[in-house]
């Protein structure tokens, strides 16, 4: 609830970035897979659960990174980690490891296109495949990424992608004292 209170305070011009943008440890590698930088993982956690380890969504997603149990089970197998459903909402490190491994795989699957990976994390890879087909494909220079995001059919996913990218820029500034240039959000190779 600290993030919600910090958001309310910021509306009154009292900024508490320490609470509005919490910082926790994130992995760099999981069983050989390179994981995106902390700023990106923290951006997803902030948007998914506001750092509430016990968060449960109406759809059944669990923990800090709001993993669906079925997805978590598949990712655990890929990451060569044991799958224990109860740990999704009780063990922050476990949840972050699985979620980080999953988002890293999505980024690789989309050749570094963060907007695709973020949208797939929220709505699933099949939806992104469909949206690339009907909205055209920025990787083929058929449309610009900003326009592609605006054409996402689900308001929730469109907003989610925008907020994660926004959070990412804020976290980059907090952690490294430098925001990321907008053009680098949309390049077709991983930032990590």
For each of these PLM feature ranges, what is it?
Residues 1-192:
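Catalytic glycan-binding domains that act on GlcNAc-containing polysaccharides
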């Amino acid at each position: 609830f600290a993030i919600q209170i910090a958001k309310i305070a910021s509306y009154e011009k009292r900024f508490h970035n320490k609470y509005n943008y919490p910082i926790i440890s994130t992995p760099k590698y999981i069983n050989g897979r390179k994981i995106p930088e902390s700023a990106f993982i923290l951006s997803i956690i902030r948007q998914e659960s506001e750092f509430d380890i016990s968060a449960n969504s109406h759809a059944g997603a669990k923990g800090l990174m709001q993993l669906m149990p079925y997805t978590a089970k598949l990712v655990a197998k890929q990451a060569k980690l044991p799958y224990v459903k109860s740990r999704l909402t009780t063990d922050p490190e476990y949840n972050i490891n699985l979620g980080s491994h999953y988002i890293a795989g999505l980024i690789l699957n989309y050749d570094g296109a963060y907007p695709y990976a973020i949208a797939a994390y929220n709505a699933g890879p099949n939806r992104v495949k469909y949206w690339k087909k009907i909205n055209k494909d920025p990787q083929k220079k058929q449309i610009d990424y900003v326009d592609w995001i605006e054409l996402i059919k689900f308001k929730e996913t469109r907003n989610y992608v925008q907020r994660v990218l926004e959070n990412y820029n804020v976290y980059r500034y907090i952690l490294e004292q430098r925001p990321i240039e907008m053009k680098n959000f949309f390049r077709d190779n991983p930032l990590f």
